[in-house]
Regions:
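Domain-level signature for soluble enzymes in the chorismate/prephenate branch of the shikimate pathway
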Residues: 1-291
Length: 291
């Protein structure tokens, strides 16, 4: 069975998330055969691979406890779901530690520091100090891609995982993580073509495009869930490309798609006519983050 993740190799947190989740699946279900992990350049490519059935499942980062929602992921799901149909079927949490590393530990400052945008934001204090010292900051598609590039050039430093240092043969220059806050965690979604079976402790996600010209449209949309005592866990506005000040809202709530309260709320929302496009259900899956 093929599993897609953010590559280019096993040095990324996407790979660690995939390995963690599917190793547990293998143990739980007593599978004798393993999984084939396939790297992709970005989250959009992972989603496309799942939608086109190139792989069975994909693993994509959705939220970090420090940096918040990964907008790239929401846009990718919105785009590919509209073409092929995708479902979030599970979630897994991975601890995040980021380190400063180079090919050689020669004491010299690098000419540039590279990494994924989310990793750089999580290390903003360290990155600011590097900028003040004249080091150029550049973005790459993943921490793994950045580490791979740094392994070929001693003038380039990277912020990545300690796993990246091992795989790409880089020297970690700071023994401690350079993240702004310790105990960072990232939540990853497992995406496929079907949502998961009900467990009794679940989450459900929708994507909606609200009509901006209607007063109180967001309040009315959220109200259909609040009136039924359905707990909203996450509301995130993702800008729609080409439509200024228009948003696709990701709504994540506690419960399962077949729960009577959610069915009733979803039905009422659709009747209100607040959505520019048909609202979309993108998955119900076991809740692993709520206390």
């Amino acid at each position: 069975m093929k599993i897609g993740y953010l590559g280019p190799n096993e040095s990324t947190f996407g790979y660690l998330a995939a390995e963690k989740f599917f190793d547990q699946v293998k143990k739980t279900e007593g599978l004798e055969t393993g999984f084939e992990f396939t790297p992709y350049k970005n989250h959009n490519e992972v989603c496309y691979a799942v939608g086109s059935k190139e792989v069975k499942y994909g693993v994509i980062a959705v939220e970090n406890v420090i940096d918040g929602v990964v907008a790239e992921t929401i846009r990718a799901i919105d785009n590919i779901d509209g073409q092929f149909g995708l479902k979030v079927c599970a979630e897994v949490v991975v601890p995040i530690e980021l380190f400063y590393m180079k090919k050689e530990n020669n004491g010299a400052l690098p000419k540039k520091l590279i990494s994924h945008v989310v990793a750089l934001r999580q290390c903003s204090h360290f990155v600011s100090k590097m900028q003040a010292d004249g080091v150029a900051i550049e973005l790459r598609d993943s921490t793994g891609a950045a580490a791979q590039e740094a392994s070929t050039n001693p003038d380039i430093a990277v912020i990545a995982s300690n796993n990246a240092a091992k795989i790409c043969n880089l020297q970690i220059l700071n023994k401690e993580s350079v993240t702004d806050h310790k105990n960072s965690l990232t939540r990853f979604w497992i995406i496929g073509k079907e949502h998961a079976n009900k467990t009794g402790k679940d989450k459900t996600c929708f994507l909606i495009n609200l009509e901006q010209s209607v007063s109180g449209s967001l309040w009315k949309a959220l109200g259909v869930f609040a009136e039924r005592n359905i707990n909203l866990l996450l509301i995130y506005p993702c800008p729609i490309p080409g439509k200024h000040w228009e948003y696709t809202f990701l709504i994540e709530l506690r419960g399962y798609i077949t729960d009577p309260g959610i069915i009733d709320a979803w039905s009422e929302f659709r009747k209100l006519g607040l959505s520019l496009n048909p609202p979309r259900f993108i998955g119900s899956y076991p809740d692993v983050t709520s206390q």
